[in-house]
Amino acid sequence: GLTRSELEYISKMGKSAIKTSRRDLSAVLSKGLVGGTTVSGTMVASAMVGIPIFVTGGIGGVHYGAERTFDVSADLSELGRSPVAVVCAGVKSILDIGLTLEYLETHGVTVATFGDSLEFPAFFTPNSGFKVPYNVKTPEEAATMIDYNLQMGLKSGMVIGVPIPESHAVLGTQIEAAIQQALQDAKSKRISGKEVTPFVLQRVNQLTKGKSLEANIALIQNNALVGSQIALELSKLREIGTYGKPQTIPNISEEHAPKTKIQPVVIGGSNVDFTAKANFEIM
């Protein structure tokens, strides 16, 4: 919805633009500031206008040491209350991926991988060491799963993890080593909170001499390809009338219908309270 000049203006803002999550939206809008939305902020806007799916690089998560600092990305809580599917390359390895997946499970967020593997991707590498319960092998399958989430009126979102293309996954080991070094650098400089991620990514780019940026671009392009294919299939479901609408259960054919009359059995109990008012002193 932006003009070319508006896009150029925002792109030139750089770090002056406010990192905008759910908590920042009202302040940024009321003050007329320029903000760049996080996954959380984008989910809020998408849910408001009925956009059921969008693509990003990776989602935020639970930071290491969160049991002391409570440093948990607002992306996760938003996924638990906005019915929007997020297509991404998983969670950056600078975060505690295991606890991130546990948090999403607790908040009722469906997490699935795209492809044959159940292993959740770790942004720069296809393998995080953590498996998720579900995977979708085709855009059609992913769209159907999103459709059912909308049909049931669930208020939670979904995460579809797309592994980085194999052509760039070979850089994973080098990038992982650089990430660990960058984390140590951030700790020594006492960088914390929302400043950690941009610092680490910039430092990793320096340590890998631009290779991490190349891999980052490749995975975002791949996410966009997969996400657009899923969106197309979801649009087809909308055209045939199943999108976001409850589907009727097909009638059982006579061939498979029960041959005998079945009497239902109800097991359980109920408590009923009676209130009575006496009209006579002696009953």
Q: Language model features by range: what are they?
A:
Residues 149, 154-219:
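A C-terminal functional module that forms or caps the active site or interfaces directly
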Residues 35-38, 53-58, 64, 86-88, ...:
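General beta-strand structural signal in soluble alpha/beta enzymes
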Residues 1-29, 151-167, 172-174:
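Glycine-rich nucleotide/cofactor/substrate-binding loop typically near the N-terminus or early
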Residues 250-283:
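Glycine-rich phosphate/adenosyl-contacting loop at the front of the ribokinase-like
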Residues 124-151:
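Anionic-ligand binding region
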Residues 44-48, 53-55, 71, 76-81, ...:
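Solvent-exposed alpha-helices and their adjacent loops that cap or buttress functional pockets
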Residues 96-128, 140:
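Glycine-rich, Lys/Arg-enriched anion-binding loops that position phosphate/diphosphate groups
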